A protein has these predicted regions:
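Short, positively charged patches
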Residues: 1-147
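Glycine-biased, small-residue-rich flexible motifs in mid-sequence functional cores and linkers
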Residues: 2-4, 85-376
Length: 376
C-alpha cells in the first residue's frame, strides 16, 4: 500500500499543466514512483532522454499543483475516500497493463478490485423491458454457474443501473465507475443504489473532487470499465452509443466482447445486431453461453479437486522456485503474473515456465485475465 507522500505526489502529477497522459505514463512506468519523479525533477532527462520540454517544465514548476493535491488528499481522508496510485497493490492489475491507464484512482467501497473474474455490463440509457429482462435472467443464471464475479458498469440510466441493481439483488459485488469526483453523484436519482454499492462493491473514479460530469469524462471513464474487466457484455444499443465505445475499447485491450441479439428493426437492438454481424462481438443468448465461451466452468473443477482431497501436503515434490510461488499464492490468493514476478523476484520468462509446470502438476489453475489460483 502506498504511503501518503506517494499518494500526494501522484495526485500532484495529475494536476500539472501538461496534457499528454502518454508522456507522463512513460516516465512514471520507467521510474515506478511519483515521489522519485519529483526527487529527480531537475535531472529528468537522465531518466527519460526524450522527455518533452513541456513535461520537464511542468514537473519543475509544480507548486500550484501541490496545493490542489494537498486539498484533495485532505478531503479524501476526511470523507473516507481511498486514493489508489498505480504502484499500489490494490490498483486493478488488468487496468494497469493498459497503455492509457490513469495514474491514480479514487475509491469508496469494500470490494477487491483484482478479483479472479470481472465483467462489465453496458448498453443504452434507454433500456427497454426486453433489455431489463435480459439483464435479470443473465445475472440470476450467472450466479448459479459462477458465483464469484465482480460486475462493473457506469451507474448511468438504463442498462447500467439495472445491471447494478440486479447484481446487488443476486449477492454479487458491483462497482460503479464514475465520470466525476466522489464528492457528488450523477445522476442523483441513483444515490440509494450507490449507497448500497459502497457496502457491496464500491464507487470508483479517476477524477478529483470538484470535477463536473462533463460529456468527455463519460468517454474517458469507459476505458476504466473496459480495462478492469475480463469481458464486456452489451445488452442493448442503438446504432451509435456509449456502450459501443466500451466494446471498441475492450477489443483494443484484447478483452472478450459479447452481445445479446435483438429483434430486427428495434432501434435499441440495432447496435448489438450490427456488432455481431461485423464480428465485433460473440453472440450469446444466455449466461450458460457466456460461461462456456469464457471457460468458466472451473468452479466445478475446483470443487471436485477439494472433494478429492488435493491438499498442499499432497502436492508433488516442488522445486525451491515452485515452492516460493506456492507460498506467495497461499498468502495473497489470486494474482496476475506481473505481481507474482514482483513478489517472488523471478523474471517473467522464467516465471511463465514455472507456472506452466505447476499447472501441469495440478497445483495451480489459470483463469481469464492471466490470474493464477492455488488449488487448496
Amino acid at each position: 500500500m502506498a504511503d501518503q507522500q506517494e499518494i500526494l505526489n501522484t495526485i500532484l502529477l495529475t494536476r500539472l499543466n501538461y496534457f499528454s497522459l502518454a508522456g507522463m505514463l512513460e516516465l512514471y512506468r520507467k521510474v515506478g514512483s511519483a515521489t522519485l519523479i519529483l526527487e529527480h525533477k531537475n535531472n529528468l532527462r537522465d531518466i527519460l532522454p526524450d522527455a518533452s520540454d513541456k513535461l520537464v517544465s511542468a514537473i519543475q514548476n509544480c507548486e500550484e499543483a501541490r496545493k490542489r493535491a494537498e486539498e484533495e488528499l485532505e478531503y479524501d481522508i476526511r470523507y473516507g475516500i481511498e486514493p489508489i496510485p498505480m504502484n499500489d497493490d490494490r490498483y486493478p492489475q488488468r487496468l494497469k497493463d493498459c497503455d492509457d491507464a490513469p495514474l491514480i484512482l479514487f475509491y469508496k467501497g469494500n470490494a477487491n478490485l483484482n478479483q479472479q473474474r470481472v465483467i462489465n455490463i453496458v448498453g443504452t440509457r434507454h433500456c427497454t423491458p426486453y433489455g431489463e429482462d435480459l439483464i435479470r435472467r443473465f445475472i440470476t443464471d450467472l450466479k448459479q454457474l459462477s458465483p464469484n464475479v465482480l460486475i462493473i458498469s457506469g451507474l448511468a440510466y438504463g442498462v447500467d443501473i439495472v445491471a447494478h441493481r440486479q447484481a446487488l439483488a443476486n449477492g454479487y459485488e458491483t462497482i460503479g465507475v464514475l465520470a466525476h469526483g466522489l464528492d457528488d453523484l450523477y445522476p442523483r436519482q441513483h444515490r440509494e443504489t450507490a449507497a448500497r454499492m459502497i457496502e457491496q462493491g464500491g464507487l470508483l473514479t479517476e477524477f478529483l473532487t470538484r470535477t463536473n460530469a462533463d460529456k468527455i469524462n463519460f468517454v474517458r471513464r469507459n476505458r476504466i470499465v473496459a480495462g478492469m474487466s475480463d469481458a464486456c457484455i452489451l445488452i442493448e444499443s442503438a446504432a451509435h452509443g456509449g456502450g459501443l465505445i466500451t466494446c471498441d475499447i475492450s477489443q483494443s485491450y484484447g478483452r472478450d466482447v459479447f452481445a445479446f441479439p435483438g429483434r430486427i428493426g428495434d432501434h435499441y437492438s440495432e447496435g448489438c445486431n450490427n456488432l455481431i454481424r461485423n464480428n465485433g462481438a460473440t453472440l450469446i443468448t444466455s449466461a450458460e453461453d457466456f460461461v462456456k465461451d469464457m471457460r468458466w466452468q472451473d468452479d466445478a473443477t475446483l470443487m471436485r479437486a477439494k472433494q478429492q482431497g488435493i491438499e498442499r501436503s499432497l502436492f508433488p515434490e516442488l522445486s525451491s522456485e515452485e515452492q516460493l510461488i506456492v507460498d506467495v499464492l497461499s498468502k495473497t490468493n489470486d494474482l496476475q503474473v506481473n505481481l507474482i514476478s514482483v513478489k517472488t523476484n523471478i523474471d517473467i520468462s522464467r516465471l511463465t515456465s514455472l507456472l506452466f509446470t505447476l499447472e501441469m502438476k495440478g497445483v495451480i489453475k489459470t483463469f481469464a485475465g492471466g490470474m493464477y489460483h492455488l488449488l487448496k
